[in-house]
Each structure stands twice: as structure tokens, then as C-alpha cells.
């Protein structure tokens, strides 16, 4: 008998959820995850996206050029603020997406909560829209190795299964709609990303 993992039907598509929203992405980063998330967000056609980072580095310029072109092609307004995160960006945007390197207890995010601004991260957005069953791996050490090996084992039963999460260039949100709904996704999820995950969780969790 074939193995099955149950799924949960989601009420909205990403495009419906992000329509007419002004987005703030805090943290572009240089490891590729922030860039991939920004690409995905732009393709959902929000009204606008502001991307901020506390660093002001020439290393960002290739990513900025590519994201600017992508935004123009998708008719999305885009703005970059480098060297700081600003209060005005918290106040003027509808939804805040935080990079995993951003501590959740910084004053700007405290302000966001006071102003009732929704705060999301890669994992929480992923669980708003995922139609596949998921297996989550968290813990102190060995998460990536465990994630890759579990995916390797699952491929014997689910050849189209994929893995990602806290892995460079493979953020969870970029995995949406990549494989048929009944095929599982194996995720590496750091504990600090789980802090924002409220009423959703992996179908199977490993610590």
C-alpha cells in the first residue's frame, strides 16, 4: 500500500494575499536567501516592496540590479534602503517580512507590534500557502545533514519530494508549487523562525 501524508487546503493563493499590499522586507543578506525571497515576493505582484538592510555593501549591487529589473517587468514599485532599518518604513507598509538574521526583539519590531503590523518570515508565509505535507527538522546541530538524509530516504517512496528551508538559495517560500501536492517537502527550520509560527506546524517534526 502506498504511503500517504495528509494535506490542508488553503483558502487564498499568494497572489490574492499580496494583492494591493505594500511590503517591507527587512534584510537582504549576502547568502542568497533574502534575494530568493525578494524574487518570489515580487512575482506575487504586490503594490510595492521596500527592502532594507543594516549593511551598506557593494556585494548587494548585483542583487539590487536583478531585483530592480524583475520589479519593473512585473510592474511592482521597489525601493532599497541600505545601511539602516527605518521607523518610517515600519509605519508606511502593510506587511513586514523579516530575514532570519533580524532579532525579533529589536525596537522597530516592537513598534510594529504596537501598531498592529503583521510580521512574517519565510516559514510563516510558506505555511500560509503550502499544499504539500511537510516534515520539519529543528535542533542545535546537524539540521542540514538530517534534512538532506531524510529527503534522500523519502525519495524512494516520493521521487518528486524536495527539501529546503534554512539552506542557502532554498528558502521554504521558494519551494511552493514546485511539486505535486501529495509529495512531501522536508524543511530545515531554526528555532528562531519557529517563534512566529502560531497555529500551523509540520505534519511530522524531528528535533
Question: Over which residues does each language-model region extend?
Answer:
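Phosphate-binding loop of NTP-binding sites
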Residues: 88-91, 100-207
Amino acid at each position: 500500500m502506498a504511503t500517504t501524508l495528509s494535506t490542508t487546503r488553503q483558502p487564498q493563493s499568494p497572489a490574492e494575499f499580496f494583492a494591493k499590499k505594500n511590503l517591507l522586507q527587512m534584510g537582504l543578506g549576502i547568502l542568497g536567501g533574502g534575494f530568493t525571497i525578494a524574487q518570489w515576493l515580487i512575482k506575487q505582484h504586490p503594490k510595492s516592496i521596500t527592502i532594507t538592510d543594516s549593511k551598506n555593501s557593494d556585494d548587494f549591487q548585483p542583487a539590487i540590479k536583478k531585483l530592480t529589473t524583475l520589479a519593473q517587468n512585473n510592474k511592482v514599485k521597489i525601493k532599497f534602503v541600505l545601511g539602516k532599518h527605518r521607523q518610517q518604513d515600519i509605519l508606511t507598509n502593510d506587511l513586514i517580512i523579516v530575514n532570519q538574521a533580524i532579532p525579533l526583539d529589536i525596537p522597530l519590531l516592537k513598534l510594529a507590534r504596537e501598531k498592529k503590523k503583521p510580521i512574517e518570515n519565510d516559514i510563516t508565509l510558506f505555511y500560509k500557502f503550502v499544499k504539500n505535507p511537510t516534515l520539519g527538522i529543528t535542533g542545535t546541530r546537524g539540521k542540514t545533514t538530517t534534512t538532506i538524509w531524510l529527503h534522500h530516504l523519502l525519495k524512494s517512496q516520493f521521487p518528486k519530494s524536495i527539501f529546503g528551508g534554512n539552506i542557502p538559495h532554498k528558502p521554504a517560500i521558494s519551494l511552493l508549487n514546485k511539486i505535486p501536492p501529495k509529495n512531501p517537502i522536508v524543511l530545515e527550520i531554526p528555532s528562531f523562525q519557529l517563534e512566529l509560527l502560531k497555529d500551523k506546524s509540520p505534519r511530522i517534526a524531528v528535533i
